[in-house]
């Protein structure tokens, strides 16, 4: 209940921010945080709750961005373009999920990374290097609708994952993560639950890619397929607390703000610093900021008793 109340207050605070300030730098920072929440939460469903450590998340992000951008620039209503992008990402997810789920462990991760790279190279060879929005749309560009769209998307991703994980289906997904053979023996269809987690995950990240394409004035199709998006999702989820609802939210806040600070102070070293931070988190705080906060609370409680 406390987490729900905290989430509502946080979302309300972000929703009220444009009423307090019109500074574009703060609103753009908010958009980056919301996109990071959605990106990490969509990966968290498949990688954290279903236990399928995919390294191909960027493929679905890129497909959502590409389809949405093409349709929206072509004159389609934004909501239809976003829905089409998510639908294409989901369809591609099912297409590669059926053969990919035959692989286990590291082989699954490497296989999804290889498929994502094949798609990235293909798009780079077939699509133009850059896409800019039409002059009429550029003249009327406004950060506010992008801000509220990405905020709504972040809230939607958190809510969908929370509802799914808390349902009977979510119990089956987690059972498959813990022991696939035991889950099968108990009557839980492992492939069915993994495919369902994949479909929801790819739909959410497809919407996220579409929102990214709508947000940017200049859009590089191949950039949206970069493996950096996958590793950002992993890093945010693990820093915050993988396999938890609020972990990706905490991770996104920390990651985006800290990244902005590092990009100014140590522009050439921020990637190295995050790499070292990721290793330290995995080694000493595998539960991320969520675990660190729990440890701190227990320590404070012991000292006050």
Residue ranges and their predicted role:
Residues 1-305:
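Transmembrane alpha-helices and adjacent helix-loop boundaries
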């Amino acid at each position: 209940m406390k987490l729900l109340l905290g989430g509502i207050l946080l979302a309300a605070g972000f929703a009220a921010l444009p009423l307090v300030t019109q500074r574009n730098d703060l609103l753009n920072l908010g958009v980056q945080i919301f996109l990071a929440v959605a990106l990490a939460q969509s990966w968290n469903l498949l990688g954290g709750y279903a236990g399928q450590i995919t390294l191909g998340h960027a493929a679905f992000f890129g497909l959502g961005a590409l389809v949405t951008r093409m349709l929206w620039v072509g004159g389609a209503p934004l909501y239809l373009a976003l829905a089409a992008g998510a639908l294409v990402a989901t369809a591609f997810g099912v297409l590669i999920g059926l053969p990919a789920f035959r692989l286990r462990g590291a082989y699954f991760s490497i296989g999804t990374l290889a498929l994502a790279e094949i798609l990235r190279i293909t798009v780079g060879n077939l699509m133009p290097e850059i896409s800019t929005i039409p002059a009429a749309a550029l003249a009327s560009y406004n950060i506010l609708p992008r801000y509220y769209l990405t905020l709504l998307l972040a809230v939607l991703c958190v809510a969908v994952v929370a509802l799914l994980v808390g349902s009977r289906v979510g119990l089956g997904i987690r059972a498959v993560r813990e022991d696939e053979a035991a889950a099968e023996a108990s009557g839980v269809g492992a492939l069915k639950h993994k495919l369902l987690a994949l479909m929801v995950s790819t739909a959410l990240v497809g919407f996220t890619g579409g929102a990214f394409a709508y947000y940017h004035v200049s859009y590089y199709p191949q950039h949206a397929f970069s493996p950096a998006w996958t590793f950002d999702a992993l890093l945010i989820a693990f820093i915050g607390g993988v396999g938890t609802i609020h972990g990706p939210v905490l991770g996104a806040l920390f990651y985006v703000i800290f990244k902005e600070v590092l990009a100014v102070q140590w522009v050439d070293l921020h990637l190295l610093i995050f790499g070292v931070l990721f290793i330290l988190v995995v080694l000493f705080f595998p539960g991320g900021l969520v675990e660190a906060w729990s440890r701190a609370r227990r320590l404070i409680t012991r000292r006050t008793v």
